[in-house]
UniProtKB/Swiss-Prot annotation:
Residues 1-25 are annotated as: Disordered. GO terms for molecular function: rRNA binding; structural constituent of ribosome. Residues 1-23 have a biased composition (Basic and acidic residues). Keywords: Ribonucleoprotein, Ribosomal protein, RNA-binding, rRNA-binding. The lineage of its organism: Bacteria, Pseudomonadati, Pseudomonadota, Alphaproteobacteria, Hyphomicrobiales. This is Small ribosomal subunit protein uS15. One of its GO terms (biological process) is translation. Pfam families: Ribosomal_S15. One of its GO terms (cellular component) is cytosolic small ribosomal subunit. Part of the 30S ribosomal subunit. Forms a bridge to the 50S subunit in the 70S ribosome, contacting the 23S rRNA. InterPro entries: Ribosomal_uS15, Ribosomal_uS15_bac-type, uS15_NS1_RNA-bd_sf. One of the primary rRNA binding proteins, it binds directly to 16S rRNA where it helps nucleate assembly of the platform of the 30S subunit by binding and bridging several RNA helices of the 16S rRNA. Forms an intersubunit bridge (bridge B4) with the 23S rRNA of the 50S subunit in the ribosome.
Length: 89
């Protein structure tokens, strides 16, 4: 269900702005998107896992808040991010 350290490092390298960037909204959204994707796959086999479903809704809400922040600050950056991650909006 959770992402591996190697995958998280790869996501950070892929979405960071500079060499020391690990916490920008883009990186956080990319990591949350990966976790959401993993949980969505989990529900294909465990449809009645309501405890995890609540966690999924929390992750989606957190990602939505970060995306709203990016959109408020820079619309072009927001559009590029959702296109790169394949998020529909």
């Amino acid at each position: 269900m959770s992402i591996t350290a190697e995958r998280k490092t790869a996501l950070i390298k892929e979405h960071r702005k500079d060499a020391k960037d690990t916490g920008s909204p883009e990186v956080q959204v990319a990591i949350l998107t990966e976790r959401i994707t993993n949980l969505t796959g989990h529900f294909k086999t465990h449809g009645k896992d309501n405890h995890s479903r609540r966690g999924l809704l929390k992750l989606v809400s957190q990602r939505r808040s970060l995306l709203d922040y990016v959109k408020r600050k820079d619309e072009a950056r927001y559009r590029a991010l959702i296109e790169r991650l394949g998020i529909r909006r």
